[in-house]
Amino acid sequence: AIGPSTLSLLGLVRHMAEVERAWFRRRLAGQADLGYVYCSDEFPDGDFDLTAPAGAEADFLAFDAECRLADAAAAGRSLDDTFRSRSGTPMDLRWIYLHMIEEYARHNGHADVLREQIDGVTGD
């Protein structure tokens, strides 16, 4: 049997707010001490913990804000602009964009599975 999961559509939105912040602001823009949106060192999966959510509207606004701030962090930069990963490995903006495509593709797939469980409709 599969155990319970905290995966939810709202959790995915919250998670992507964290991901946008982590790669564009904390890594690319060098704001390493910028805190988390929902997570913490104590609760690394806080983005999926909906026991005390701020509310869906606030979560969607937070996601939108992080996307706008990510756009601002990347504005005017070359795809070859480099930064250091947490481990100190040099990386570039091109890598972030490719990674974000992977992140969104993966989590859109998760969202599709959740939607299918609700409405039973499958794709072509």
Model-derived segments and their meaning:
Residues 44-84, 94-100:
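Acidic/histidine-rich alpha-helical segments that form the ligand environment
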